[in-house]
Structure formats: structure tokens, C-alpha cells
């Protein structure tokens, strides 16, 4: 079966934004204009097509990044048909993991900003993730019809807060109630959308007289940005500012966008049906197809040290990455995957290279939000969902068994908050275990474990809302009612000084075969780098085969530190000396010796407790500023800055506060500000806990 759309005409894009910037509405409009959905779903009444989880519809926030396919021939029908795969990403900080995993499989992104709120904390997180995966992006300033809308302020914020070079390719005609359309700076024409047809029809008009000067000023900046794409263009531009053709400008802006040097910027109001169509044109004009981005990297299946790559071509061996797992009430488990190379058909056997397991690919479904179409095959550049894969989890490589490869893995953040959870009835115990495992399989930032001492089931995640929603899903999707304990902070332990030449000796010699292991280590702090083990044994004082056992003994001990039994992080261990016994030495003895040496060394190296620090941003009316600041200080918060919210909307306070002090914050913020302030928080880093707090935590844990 030949390819329907050439791969050059594919665009795999994400639409990401801060909560309430209007991202789901924007996606809805895209589906409407590309002819997929006939009734526009509004988030305002909880009916959006993309928000297909019930909680998302209740809370008005998008929770899972559904993948949807749409086709577009341009606003004026002037392009060959392009295929746009859209991954809708959540904008709430507790779902950062969702954004992260979709960034991994995207080729480009459209960042949606609120014309009034501009660049907000979540926008910064998303921007950092896009930088990490080198995702080219365009910016769409939405809600231009709101009071206080200011396109140029957002342009400035992208530069100041995100260090991005935003190049407007449009400017708005009017704002707030008077927002009518945009000036296209490439064509130097005004675009006015027709309200009757919900914006499907539009006209090109002359630029309004009062905007001519401003349009020329911004066009000049845009053309200059385009000219910097190459020496030839720059020369041509310097010779005559008006000499660059429309095609040259577009090609140059495209080149610089794909190189992550600039961010083309557009505006509109998705809710009022203005601007989204031109944004779709910009997706085609400026964002990359799979062939415009570098080949996907990985390593050889048999040799992890040997790099390997796959190019976006149907002729290369099949390779793909499973980036999301969802449980569907009708077909069971759906594995969303992005195909990087080759072709695969339903019924084919694929290799899960990450787990070294072969599986038969059942049905392949292409998703339109929550509706699905069964398809026979997928090719390089496609995004689809597979049914029938039992073993796959997020981040696994699925590939051709004859030509295996393991693609780069995804990095997932460690959870910062945990809660004990118990089923309300004994009968639910087994069901709860099943439900939690299923949810953990879908969401790698959610962990489930059993506390060895208390026997309780502990769930951990990225924030209170994250765990709340998972407990809620357990009830809805699996019918399990559960009671949850108080949230607990994920403390860590580490050391502040070096402890040199500490020995651990494990000797048992009482009749029969004895045990003998002896290891000498030096332990030092290793800030921000995790655990490292260095083998510095000379002259075979510990035989080669026992060295991994020492490392293993230490790794096992890291799970529970000497202060209060919290996991140990950021330490470096040098194994420097030891001894062995010809008969009595074995792996177990050296494992014990390693463990004993580490515990002893940790006690000597000034162990300290670390706690998660959160970046907190509070938006508050000015009258309550004193209350908010006082409250943050009482929570051991350090205020790092304040600024006015645009449009006279009060103040924005940025602070760093320990997570331990943030429980129940939303309730106390509401009462301190008569419900008029809002806040967001996200994990920033671990920091040393002050002595008095540390003591209280240790005493509480030891009791």
C-alpha cells in the first residue's frame, strides 16, 4: 500500500501552554477547520473533543495528551494536502511528565500564550523541556479579545523570561472588544475573518491607515531576522531592504525556526474563531517535517556502547518509541507510539528491544481525540495507537526483530510526594493492587510500593493534584474506593564531608564453611550527580569477581540512610583496599562488607537531611500582598521577586518554599485573600533541611 501523504508534508506538533491559555479551545478549532469535527466543542461547557477523561472535563483542564490526526490544505486552499498529527499536552504543573513525554516524540511545537497573562511559570517549564529536546516552535498569542490583551508585551516577555527570540510575522488589528483580525507582515495585507461562517471564510484587505506605520516597523524587524539566515540573503537585504521576495522570507524564517534560532509569533482568538487558520498555515510554513530534524539516535541492541541511528524513511528498518499508555474502556490497553523509520502492519511481530521480548502487533488505531479508526499499517513519521501489546511501557523501543535498535530512553522525574492508600473494604484489596499497577504503567512519574515496616501501600507522585486525580481514576475506572493518608514529603539523605578509609569487615567462622569479606572505602559528597562507585583496588587485594558485590551491597544500603531511613543521594564511593580468604570469601560476604563500610562511613561524613524545594508563584490583588508575603515567610519561604501583573491585575510573587510547608496551602491562601489569589508550584531542587526541622523529622520517623 503506497504512502498517502509524502513524509515531507507531515507535521508532528504539540500544542502546549499554561493552564487556561486556551490551548484545548485552540486544538478544537484546528479540528473544526481541518474538517474533522463538525460541532465545535467548547471547554467552557465541558464538551471538548480532546479532553476525553471525565476529570479533565469536570476540572476544565486537559489531563492526557491525546494524539489526533488532521489534514490541511492552507487557509486559502493554496497548499498540497498536509497531514498534521497533533499531540495535545496538559498545562498543569502536576502533569509536567505528560508534556515531557510528548516533547520527546514531537518535531515541532506551537506555544499558546494568554494575551493578558503572557509567559507564566508553566510556560517556562514547557519552554525548558522544548529546549532539552531541541524542539523548534512558533508562538500563538491567544485570547486577543480579552480586556488587557497586549501582543507586544508577550513578545517582550518571551525574550526576557524565556530568552527566546520572538519574531512577529503578524500584528493584531485592535485588541479587547475591538480585535478584528491580523496584519500578515509577509504579504503586508490585513486578514479579516468572517463571523457568519465561524471564521472559515476570510478576506485580504488593505492595512488600516492607523496601523500602516507600525506594520512597516515590525515587517522591517521580521525581514531583518530572515536575512540573517545566510550571507547571500544578508547582502541582498543590505543592498536593498525591499528586495527579498515572499518565498525567500518564508524559506529563511523556516530555516532559522528549525535551527531553533527564532520563534515566529502570531495572534488571534480561538474562542472568537480568529487567527487559528493562519496559525495552521504557519505550522506548515515554519515547523519541520520528520525529514527536517536530525535522525533519531540510539544504540546497538547487542552492544550498548555502539551508537546507532534511524533516518525518517520507509526503506529503513522499522523503529518506533512507545510514548504513552492508556487504558480504554472498550479495547483495553492502548500503546501510543511514534514511528521513526520503516513500515509495520497490524499482525506483524515486533521486538520490544528495551525488554528483549517479541510481541505480535494487534490492531493499529489512528486516534481523533476519543474516536478511533482502524488502519492496516503505519509508516515513518506516523503516530498511532496499538492494541494487544502486553509488555510495552512508556519509553520502550518497538522495532524490527531482524534489525534491532534501542532508541534513546526518556528521563522521568523522581516523585516528590507520597501518601498511604488503603481500600475501604477488604474485597477491594486485590482490585486496588491491579488498578494501581495499571495506573503506574501508564504514568512513569507515579510509583507504587509497599512499606516494609507497616505493610501499607504507598503511592508517590509529582504533587497533591496528581495523586488526587489518580485516586479519583481508581474509583471511576476500576470501581475501587480508597482512603488516603496525609501526604508525606520525599526527604533524602546525603553527606557534607569526606570520610576516608572506613572499613567494613564481615567474618563468620563457626564450623563448616565460613564467610569472609573485607572492604575499605572513602565516601565523599557528589552534589547533583547521584551515586558513583569507583573501583581503585590495586594488586588484586579484592579479587575482580567480588568488586560488583561490594557495589551491590552499597547500592542496597542507599535505599535507607542512617539518619531516618530515607534514600541516600549524591555520594561518591571509592573502593580503595580490602582483603579476602581463599576459601571463605564469596559474593554475599563482600556485599555485607560493602554495606557495613558504607553505613559506618556515612555516620562519619556529617549526614544531613534534604527536602524538596518548590518554586511557588502567587498572583494576588494588591490589598492582600502583606498577608501573602507574611504567610509565605511563616512557611520558611524565601521571596525571590515581585512584579506587577499586566493590566492592573495585582501582583505576582515568586518564592521558593519547602514542600513540607505547602500542604493545605490552597485553603489558607483562599481564606487570606477572600478567594481572590491563585498560585502554582512545581518542584525546583533538593536543599538541606534546617537543623530544627531536621531534628523533628528524624524524631517523628524514629518513633
From Swiss-Prot:
PROSITE patterns noted in UniProt: G_TR_2 (PS51722)
Keyword GTP-binding included in the entry's annotation: yes
Database matches in InterPro entries: EFG_II (IPR041095), EFG_III (IPR009022), EFG_III/V (IPR035647), EFG_IV (IPR047872), EFG_V (IPR035649), EFG_V-like (IPR000640), EFTu-like_2 (IPR004161), P-loop_NTPase (IPR027417)
GO molecular function, one term: guanosine tetraphosphate binding
GO terms under cellular component: cytoplasm
Domain tr-type G: 8-291
Cysteine-cysteine disulfides: none
Keywords noted in UniProt: Cytoplasm, Elongation factor, GTP-binding, Nucleotide-binding, Protein biosynthesis
CDD domains documented for this protein: EF-G, EFG_III, EFG_mtEFG1_IV, EFG_mtEFG_C, EFG_mtEFG_II
Pfam families: EFG_C, EFG_III, EFG_IV, GTP_EFTU, GTP_EFTU_D2
Domain of life of the native organism: Bacteria
Residues holding GTP: 17-24, 88-92, 142-145
Localization in the cell: Cytoplasm
One Gene Ontology biological process: ribosome disassembly
HAMAP family: EF_G_EF_2_B
Family: Belongs to the TRAFAC class translation factor GTPase superfamily. Classic translation factor GTPase family. EF-G/EF-2 subfamily.
Function according to Swiss-Prot or TrEMBL: Catalyzes the GTP-dependent ribosomal translocation step during translation elongation. During this step, the ribosome changes from the pre-translocational (PRE) to the post-translocational (POST) state as the newly formed A-site-bound peptidyl-tRNA and P-site-bound deacylated tRNA move to the P and E sites, respectively. Catalyzes the coordinated movement of the two tRNA molecules, the mRNA and conformational changes in the ribosome.
Name of the protein this chain belongs to: Elongation factor G 1
Source organism per UniProt: Burkholderia orbicola (strain AU 1054)
Lineage summary: Bacteria, Pseudomonadati, Pseudomonadota, Betaproteobacteria, Burkholderiales
Gene for this chain: fusA1
Amino acid at each position: 500500500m503506497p504512502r498517502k501523504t509524502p513524509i515531507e508534508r507531515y507535521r508532528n506538533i504539540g500544542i502546549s501552554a499554561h493552564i487556561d491559555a486556551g490551548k484545548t479551545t485552540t486544538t478544537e478549532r484546528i479540528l473544526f477547520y481541518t474538517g474533522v469535527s463538525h460541532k465545535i466543542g467548547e471547554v467552557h461547557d465541558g464538551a471538548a473533543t480532546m479532553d476525553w477523561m471525565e476529570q479533565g472535563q469536570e476540572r476544565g483542564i486537559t489531563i492526557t495528551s491525546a494524539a489526533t490526526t488532521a489534514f490541511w490544505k492552507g487557509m486559502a486552499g493554496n497548499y498540497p494536502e498536509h497531514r498534521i498529527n497533533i499531540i495535545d499536552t496538559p498545562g498543569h504543573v502536576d502533569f509536567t511528565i505528560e508534556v515531557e513525554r510528548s516533547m520527546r516524540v514531537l518535531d515541532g511545537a506551537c506555544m499558546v500564550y494568554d494575551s493578558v497573562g503572557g509567559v507564566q511559570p508553566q510556560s517556562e517549564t514547557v519552554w525548558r523541556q522544548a529546549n532539552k529536546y531541541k524542539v523548534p516552535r512558533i508562538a500563538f498569542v491567544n485570547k486577543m479579545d480579552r480586556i488587557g490583551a497586549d501582543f507586544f508585551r508577550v513578545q517582550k516577555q518571551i525574550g526576557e523570561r524565556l530568552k527566546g527570540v520572538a519574531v512577529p510575522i503578524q500584528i493584531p488589528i485592535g485588541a479587547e472588544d475591538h480585535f478584528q483580525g491580523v496584519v500578515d507582515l509577509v504579504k503586508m495585507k490585513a486578514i479579516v475573518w468572517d463571523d457568519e461562517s465561524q471564521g472559515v471564510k476570510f478576506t485580504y484587505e488593505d492595512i488600516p491607515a492607523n496601523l500602516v506605520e507600525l506594520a512597516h516597523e515590525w515587517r522591517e524587524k521580521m525581514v531583518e531576522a530572515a536575512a540573517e539566515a545566510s550571507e547571500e540573503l544578508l547582502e541582498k537585504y543590505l543592498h536593498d531592504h525591499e528586495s527579498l521576495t515572499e518565498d525567500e522570507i518564508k524559506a529563511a524564517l523556516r530555516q532559522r525556526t528549525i535551527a531553533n534560532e527564532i520563534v515566529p509569533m502570531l495572534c488571534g482568538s480561538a474562542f472568537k474563531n480568529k487567527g487559528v487558520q493562519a496559525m495552521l498555515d504557519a505550522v506548515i510554513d515554519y515547523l519541520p517535517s520528520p525529514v527536517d530534524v536530525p535522525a533519531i539516535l540510539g544504540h546497538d541492541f547487542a552492544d550498548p556502547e555502539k551508537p546507532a541511528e534511524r533516518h525518517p524513511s520507509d526503506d529503513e528498518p522499522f523503529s518506533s518509541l512507545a510514548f504513552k499508555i492508556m487504558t480504554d474502556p472498550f479495547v483495553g490497553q492502548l500503546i501510543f507510539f511514534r514511528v521513526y523509520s520503516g513500515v509495520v502492519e497490524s499482525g506483524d511481530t515486533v521486538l520490544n528491544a528495551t525488554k528483549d521480548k517479541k510481541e505480535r502487533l494487534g490492531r493499529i488505531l489512528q486516534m481523533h481525540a476519543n474516536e478511533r479508526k482502524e488502519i492496516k499499517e503505519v509508516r515513518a513519521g506516523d503516530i498511532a495507537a496499538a492494541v494487544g501489546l502486553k509488555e510495552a511501557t512508556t519509553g520502550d523501543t518497538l522495532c524490527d526483530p531482524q534489525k534491532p535498535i534501542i532508541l534513546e530512553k526518556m528521563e522521568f522525574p523522581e516523585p516528590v510526594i507520597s501518601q498511604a492508600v488503603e481500600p475501604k473494604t477488604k474485597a477491594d484489596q486485590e482490585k486496588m493492587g491491579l488498578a494501581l499497577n495499571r495506573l503506574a504503567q501508564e504514568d512513569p512519574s507515579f510509583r507504587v510500593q509497599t512499606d516494609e515496616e507497616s505493610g501499607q501501600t504507598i503511592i508517590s507522585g509529582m504533587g497533591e493534584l496528581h495523586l488526587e486525580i489518580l485516586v479519583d481514576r481508581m474509583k471511576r475506572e476500576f470501581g475501587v474506593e480508597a482512603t488516603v493518608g496525609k501526604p508525606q514529603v520525599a526527604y533524602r539523605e546525603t553527606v557534607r564531608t569526606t570520610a576516608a578509609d572506613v572499613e567494613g569487615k564481615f567474618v563468620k567462622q563457626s564450623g563448616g564453611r565460613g564467610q569472609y569479606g573485607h572492604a575499605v572505602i572513602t565516601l565523599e559528597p557528589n552534589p547533583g550527580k547521584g551515586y558513583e562507585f569507583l573501583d581503585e583496588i590495586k594488586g588484586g587485594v579484592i579479587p575482580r569477581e567480588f568488586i560488583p558485590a561490594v557495589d551491590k551491597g552499597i547500592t542496597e544500603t542507599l535505599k535507607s540512610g542512617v539518619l531516618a531511613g530515607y534514600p541516600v543521594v549524591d555520594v561518591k564511593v571509592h573502593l580503595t583496599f580490602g582483603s579476602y580468604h581463599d576459601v571463605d570469601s564469596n559474593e554475599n560476604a563482600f556485599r555485607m562488607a560493602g554495606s557495613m563500610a558504607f553505613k559506618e562511613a556515612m555516620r562519619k561524613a556529617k549526614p544531613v537531611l534534604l527536602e524538596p524545594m518548590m518554586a511557588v508563584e502567587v498572583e494576588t490583588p494588591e490589598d492582600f500582598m502583606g498577608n501573602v508575603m507574611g504567610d509565605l515567610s511563616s512557611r520558611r519561604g524565601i521571596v525571590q521577586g515581585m512584579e506587577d501583573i499586566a493590566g492592573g491585575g495585582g501582583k505576582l510573587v515568586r518564592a521558593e518554599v519547602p514542600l513540607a510547608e505547602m500542604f493545605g496551602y490552597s485553603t489558607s491562601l483562599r481564606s487570606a485573600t477572600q478567594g481572590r489569589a491563585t498560585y502554582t508550584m512545581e518542584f525546583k531542587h533538593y536543599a538541606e533541611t534546617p537543623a530544627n526541622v531536621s531534628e523533628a523529622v528524624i524524631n517523628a520517623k524514629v518513633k
